[in-house]
Amino acid sequence: MAELSTPSPASPAPLDGGRGDELEKFTLRGARQILQLLQDLITHRGLITAHTGGGHSFMTAVLKVDEERGRVVLDPSPDPQANRRALAAPRLTCVTQLDGIRIQFPLVGLGEGQDKGRPALFAPLPAEMLRLQRREFYRLQVPLAHELSCLLKAEDLARKPVEVSARVIDIGAGGVAVVVPTGAAEFVIGGTLPACRLALPDGEPIELDLEVRNLNRQTQRNGTEQLRVGLRFAALPRAADTRIQRYIFKTERALNAKARGGL
């Protein structure tokens, strides 16, 4: 298998399918457009979060686009159980980012086999792909070197108060995604975590309320499992939005300069 970039757990959870009308204009259905976008994912060695349902996901990548056979070749998970879940799922929802643009597409009819003598997953080419860049959906993948964190005030499995220091993996105008060890706390979709503390590099932590929007267990490429928690900003203090946008802007500018060789 070709060398891949470092896995990023920042890929967001799938967008709500109930927002179809709102997302329709961002959906690609042309065969040429879909083939080109898949090829771009190969060229940029983009890591994909593949959601199998039931809150489970694993990291994968597009290895090849077989236009003649009308199929896409994916890298399997090192975890056999994750592969079994994927093969049994009626639908695989793939989510990634490419040059700051969110990409999401469904795969059905997943199968397994060999590609050039190595294990691989196969699926028919997707019928559509979502290509989205909008302020409310955009998420900055936080560089590992920044060590952005958020102190979550939640409850453990015994319903006792617990504080969990979570690593922030992506951040946007509307919320953050964090990763925590599985079993660190009891999170409920729709529940509110009050008085959490988001630490940004430019000052004191921001105290804010967070609403749990999605939960996904992720199997990393080394086989370990962690819980990804998607959180919406339920109540931001005054000027906090400006600080968050400033952090995103400065980080994007630094990353772009580095990519151009300016740093």
UniProtKB/Swiss-Prot annotation:
- Domain PilZ, which positions? 133-250
In this record, what's one Pfam family? PilZ
- Gene Ontology biological-process entries: bacterial-type flagellum-dependent cell motility; regulation of bacterial-type flagellum-dependent cell motility by regulation of motor speed
Keywords of the record: Bacterial flagellum, c-di-GMP, Nucleotide-binding
Where on the tree of life does the source sit, at the highest rank?
A: Bacteria
Report if keyword Nucleotide-binding is assigned: yes
What GO CC terms are in its UniProt record?
A: bacterial-type flagellum basal body
Q: What are the recorded GO MF terms, alphabetically?
A: cyclic-di-GMP binding
Where is it predominantly found?
other
**Where does this polypeptide localize?**
Bacterial flagellum basal body
Q: Where is this region: Disordered?
A: 1-21
Summarize the subunit comment. Answer: Monomer. Interacts with the flagellar basal bodies.
Q: Into which family does the record put it?
A: Belongs to the YcgR family.
Function text: Acts as a flagellar brake, regulating swimming and swarming in a bis-(3'-5') cyclic diguanylic acid (c-di-GMP)-dependent manner. Binds 1 c-di-GMP dimer per subunit. Increasing levels of c-di-GMP lead to decreased motility.
Its protein name is Flagellar brake protein YcgR
Which organism does this sequence originate in?
Answer: Thauera aminoaromatica
